[in-house]
Amino acid sequence: MSELEWDGRLDGDDEYCYRPETTLIVLADTIAKKHGLDPALVCALCEVESAWMPWAARYESGYKWLYIYEFDDEGYPYINLSAGKRERGQQYIKFLIQLGCSGQTEVIHQKISWGLMQIMGATARERGFRGWLTELCDPQVNLEWGCKHLRWMLDHANDYGIEMIGSSPGAFGQHTPPAHTAYQRFDPNLVDLAAAWNGGKVRIVDGKYVNEDYVKRVRKAMEGYQ
């Protein structure tokens, strides 16, 4: 039985709107609290990122921050067979063949954002997930690792600080380099976390988040779970 149920409404250009069953919201609430996170934020991220669809997946071909680890007895035998790793990785190829998968499969799966929270496969690997990345479509697995990463971002916020980019002619992204970039320590709030979840870190240009529209959507969604 599906964890989601269509509520019969259409939103915008024939986009289906789904209403999460109570079980998903309760699960998100429970796991968020386990990691010391605000359940409203986690639920809002699920709503904005995937519309509460556990099977949601998006391939991001331009994503470059892949996580590489080698085979050991406690993990699955994956390796990113990039040019620099091919020679040293030959001993692992037989394991990949036996499983019917390839290094390229792992690369592609790391570039996919998965499930309710749309956590990147590479990010889940970095946080310690060693299962099949397709398991991230399981609601409990997804929420566990999504919340684990969100908690990590909160705990390590000041390792990289908040990026402040000064004004410069033209729209953001059309000037290289920015007129001024500064990093400062900060006390992250829920809105900062939402911005970082979407953009990898908190980036502010001329007083606004670079992903301001996304942040506004999350903030509005949070109101429905408080």
Predicted regions and their residues:
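Catalytic glycan-binding domains that act on GlcNAc-containing polysaccharides
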Residues: 3-226
